[in-house]
């Protein structure tokens, strides 16, 4: 028994000082995985947790789990021989950390051998899944604001408006339908189906970008109109003819408002893209003007240098070699300026 205990104690001590294995336990649980790197990462040296005096070489990042820090670093060569263990204290190093509630990032301080700690707290503890969700939301937002979706929504809104007008004309006896004809029920069913699509659209908008949806009153009003229209269509199934007539009139107004609202939204979107394009062109034009100004200064400096060199040649009675006339450079500069203005 004593021999087994001695071997276990030596094995534990070997793990603490082994350059390929280190264990540091934390007094408080952490909400996510924390990646630690050594203070001497840039020079390829990592300090042993059980001793601050003898640095050990390591090139791998240190990995911190929720309840304990298990650091496993492997050499590039698997056949590399491990150095002999040294006799040191087996007492684990205790690190006390306090989580900050003001931000989603944990600020590390006074960690001794560690230079920094960096991790992101996800809702479910999985950062990769959160990044995937954000990417899917961006894709969904791009799809919902694309031109084909806008056109499809306008077509559905106009079709829904015609269906509601048809129901209204049938209820007003403008269009006489024989008793027992299923035409009113068919029109109402199509209208309810289109409203269901609009309800799904509103839900997808909230999922894609709820902040944008909440901060834009027009989007909220549009959602209210869709919900009211859907509720009224459901209520029409259970009410009498007189109440249905008044409700259908309200539905017509709401449908027409949606048509104008969506058309206006498309116009604003196109105008915004055009303004962005104009701003980009102006920015490039400013950069070209600055580049032209710099080239003008360089050209002026070169001309001054050439004049001084010519003067030196004249003083030494040296023939000046033929050069390109100055008017040529001026003509090139004028052409460049004209093309930039266009």
UniProtKB/Swiss-Prot annotation:
Residues 170-185, 239-247 are extracellular. GO terms for molecular function: voltage-gated proton channel activity. GO terms for biological process: cellular response to pH; cellular response to zinc ion; proton transmembrane transport. Residues 86-102 have a biased composition (Polar residues). Residues 1-148, 209-217, 269-342 are cytoplasmic. Keywords: Cell membrane, Coiled coil, Ion channel, Ion transport, Membrane, Transmembrane, Transmembrane helix, Transport, Voltage-gated channel. It is found in: Membrane; Cell membrane. InterPro entries: Hvcn1 (IPR031846), Ion_trans_dom (IPR005821), Volt_channel_dom_sf (IPR027359). The chain crosses the membrane at residues 149-169, 186-208, 218-238, 248-268. Residues 271-315 form a coiled coil. Less sensitive to zinc ions as compared to the mammalian homologs. GO terms for cellular component: monoatomic ion channel complex; plasma membrane. Gene3D superfamilies: 1.20.5.170, Voltage-gated potassium channels. Chain C. It is a multi-pass membrane protein. Pfam families: Ion_trans (PF00520). Residues 1-20, 74-102 are annotated as: Disordered. The segment S4 is probably the voltage-sensor and is characterized by a series of positively charged amino acids at every third position. Unlike other voltage-gated ion channels it lacks the pore domain. Mediates the voltage-dependent proton permeability of excitable membranes. Forms a proton-selective channel through which protons may pass in accordance with their electrochemical gradient. Homodimer. Belongs to the hydrogen channel family. This is Voltage-gated hydrogen channel 1. It comes from Ciona intestinalis (Transparent sea squirt). The gene is HVCN1.
């Amino acid at each position: 028994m004593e021999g087994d205990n001695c071997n276990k104690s030596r094995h534990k001590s070997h793990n603490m000082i082994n350059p390929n294995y280190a264990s540091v336990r934390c007094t408080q649980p952490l909400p996510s995985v924390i990646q630690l790197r050594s203070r001497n990462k840039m020079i390829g040296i990592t300090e042993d947790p059980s001793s601050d005096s003898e640095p050990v070489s390591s090139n791998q990042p240190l990995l911190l789990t929720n309840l304990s820090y298990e650091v496993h670093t492997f050499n590039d060569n698997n056949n590399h021989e491990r150095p002999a263990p040294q006799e040191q204290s087996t007492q684990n190093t205790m690190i006390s950390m306090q989580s900050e509630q003001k931000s989603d990032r944990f600020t590390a301080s006074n960690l001794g051998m560690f230079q920094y700690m960096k991790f992101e707290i996800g809702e479910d503890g999985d950062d990769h899944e959160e990044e995937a969700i954000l990417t899917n939301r961006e894709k969904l937002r791009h799809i919902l604001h694309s031109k084909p979706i806008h056109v499809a929504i306008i077509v559905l809104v106009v079709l829904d408006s015609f269906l509601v007008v048809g129901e209204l004309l049938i209820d007003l006896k403008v269009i006489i339908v024989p008793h027992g004809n299923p035409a009113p029920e068919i029109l109402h069913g199509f209208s309810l189906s289109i409203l269901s699509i609009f309800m799904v659209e509103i839900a997808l908008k909230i999922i894609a970008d709820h902040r944008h949806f909440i901060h834009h009153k027009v989007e909220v009003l549009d959602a209210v109109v869709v919900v009211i229209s859907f509720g009224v269509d459901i209520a029409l199934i259970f009410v009498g003819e007189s109440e249905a007539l008044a409700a259908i009139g309200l539905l017509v107004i709401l449908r027409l408002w949606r048509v104008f609202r969506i058309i206006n939204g498309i116009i604003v979107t196109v105008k915004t893209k055009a303004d962005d394009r104009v701003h980009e062109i102006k920015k490039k034009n400013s950069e070209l003007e600055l580049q032209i100004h710099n080239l003008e200064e360089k050209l002026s400096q070169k001309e001054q240098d050439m004049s001084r060199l010519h003067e030196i040649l004249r003083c030494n009675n040296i023939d000046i070699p033929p050069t390109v006339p100055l008017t040529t450079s001026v003509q090139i500069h004028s052409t460049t300026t004209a093309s930039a203005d266009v």
